[in-house]
Design a protein with these regions (language model features):
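Active-site-adjacent structural segments surrounding the nucleophilic cysteine of cysteine proteases
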Residues: 1-59, 145-152, 216, 223, ...
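Noncatalytic regulatory segments and standalone regulatory/sensor domains
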Residues: 2, 124-194
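Short, solvent-exposed alpha-helical surface patches in non-cytosolic proteins
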Residues: 29-34, 195-262
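Active-site-adjacent substructure of cysteine-protease-like catalytic cores
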Residues: 84-140
Length: 262
């Protein structure tokens, strides 16, 4: 099957800003969602348009995109539903059922990138996963031994790799996978008054970092100050498990000077 891939690495995007950087350098989040919507047959959205939505809804942060925030804003607009998981079996079942997924690649297993990167999985055949990569350049998947051995390039922006490799590449991100499907139209129901259910959905949509080294570098200074001050102690089992929202809040407080010792 042929796929249409939208690339953030078109030369024209070097001069178009996305927050404090350019679309070319930092719009893998919006671009991966554009590719997901196109693959599902829901919408043909340009990368700049999706970037504008990311900025307007607060998903754009220094150094990256908060995918949960972007999906929450985009879902009603483009008529899709989504959920999160870090389980390979759930990703595989979702793809085989006709859904697509955004994979959040990390920095510990540099399959899709040398640092954090979003890509879009569109198909599973057995345990072979077809992935669309918006950050494309010549020789990307022959540049390292890992990529040469574990990735097959089908066309520009279209690769296959194993389910196992997808798991390794996303192991230091929580959630690893954002599973996206066409929305099913249901009768309107009264607004939920079940705060427990609402809170569970909110928690499921949140991104968590298990260890300090998993936290994006632009948050690390502020989080380190909170740890040193004894304000963050983790889960007690060796994991920090800090949410992206808390990282953002601490970073804002640090820029205000609130975290500096008096």
């Amino acid at each position: 099957m042929a796929y249409t891939v939208k690339f953030q690495t078109e030369s024209k995007y070097k001069s178009i800003s996305y927050g404090s950087n350019s679309i070319y350098n930092s719009a893998c989040g919006p671009a991966s969602l554009c590719n997901a919507l196109k693959a599902l047959g829901l919408a043909d959205v340009s990368i700049p348009t999706m970037c504008q939505l990311a900025v307007s809804c607060g998903a754009r942060v220094d150094g990256g995109t908060v995918m949960a925030t972007l999906l929450k804003a985009a879902a009603p607009k483009y008529h899709f539903c989504y959920r999160t998981t870090s389980k390979n079996a759930e990703l595989l079942a979702h793809l085989k059922a006709g859904g697509v997924a955004i994979l959040h690649g990390g920095s510990s297993h540099k399959l899709f990138s040398n640092s954090g990167h979003f890509v879009c999985a569109v198909r599973a055949s057995g345990e072979t996963i077809t992935v669309l990569d918006s950050y494309w350049y010549a020789g990307k998947y022959t540049s390292t031994k890992l990529r040469r051995q574990k990735v097959k390039v089908l066309a520009k922006g279209v690769i296959t790799t194993s389910l196992y490799q997808c798991g390794l590449a996303t192991a230091d991100r929580a959630p690893s996978y954002y599973l996206i499907s066409k929305a099913i139209q249901k009768p309107q129901k009264p607004a939920s008054s079940n705060t427990t259910t609402d809170k569970k959905q909110e928690d499921d949509d949140m991104t968590y970092y298990k260890k300090f080294e998993n936290i994006p570098t632009w948050y690390q200074t502020a989080v380190k100050k909170a740890i040193d001050a004894g304000a963050l102690n983790g889960t007690g089992n060796g994991e920090l498990n800090v949410s992206e929202d808390l990282c953002r809040t601490l970073t804002v407080l640090d820029k205000m000077g609130t975290l500096d010792k008096k």
